Amino acid sequence: MTRLLIVGPPGAGKGTQAKRIAADRGIPDVSTGDIFRQNIKDRTELGQQVQALVDAGNYVPDELTNRLVTVRLQEEDAQAGFLLDGYPRTLAQVAYLEELLQGWGQELDAVIQLVADEDEVVARLTRRAAEQGRADDGEDEIRHRQEVYVRETSPLIDVYREHGLLVEVDGLGEVDEVAERIRTALAARGVRPSSDAGRA
């Protein structure tokens, strides 16, 4: 059973690597964005609450996000483990997740932090925006998103570092190269791919 969490700044390829790690280990890539969209699409009770908040231009509060994640982690495909992407985002969510897993007799195996030089990431995203014709995605906006990421995730990263769970990996480079770095870093912690990954 493998229980992982991945964090990384915009432009560091977190979404791509999350899918690779999940496929490698035969576990679901659990993204809060996907959970919100699926619940809205399925018109679940919680999904309708999310839709109302989004329509009003409000953030989804911790309590509702926590409930949605709890329901998702109880689904059959997450029983052999999971990779969380985009959750937790606040210290309250960190505490909730720890308590939730403890209640199930579980704990996180590792927190993968993709690290990347800010100037390189900004250059990469600026090029991508120009190629895709997104003139509104200028360097100032991109740098602002990097600053928000650092401000929001630094306290979470500090907690996971104190818990001895943090695995730092250079997120820049070819997709396969970064994936191999992650695999090596996790193996060094004793977190290896499931031998039956992908057979289900």
From Swiss-Prot:
Catalytic activity: AMP + ATP = 2 ADP
Residues the entry annotates as binding ATP: 11-16, 128, 173
PROSITE patterns for the chain: ADENYLATE_KINASE
SUPFAM superfamilies the record matches: P-loop containing nucleoside triphosphate hydrolases
Domain of life of the source: Bacteria
Region of interest (NMP), ranges: 31-60
Main localization (coarse): cytoplasm
Main enzyme class: transferase
Keywords from the named record: ATP-binding, Cytoplasm, Kinase, Nucleotide biosynthesis, Nucleotide-binding, Transferase
This enzyme's EC code(s): 2.7.4.3
Record carries keyword ATP-binding: yes
Biological processes annotated in GO: AMP salvage
Metabolic or biological pathway: Purine metabolism; AMP biosynthesis via salvage pathway; AMP from ADP: step 1/1
Cited Pfam families: ADK
Annotated InterPro entries: Adenylat/UMP-CMP_kin, Adenylat_kinase_CS, P-loop_NTPase
Family classification: Belongs to the adenylate kinase family.
NCBIfam families per record: PRK00279.1-3, PRK14527.1, PRK14531.1, PRK14532.1
Annotated domain remarks: Consists of three domains, a large central CORE domain and two small peripheral domains, NMPbind and LID, which undergo movements during catalysis. The LID domain closes over the site of phosphoryl transfer upon ATP binding. Assembling and dissambling the active center during each catalytic cycle provides an effective means to prevent ATP hydrolysis.
Protein name stated in the entry: Adenylate kinase
Organism annotation: Clavibacter sepedonicus (Clavibacter michiganensis subsp. sepedonicus)
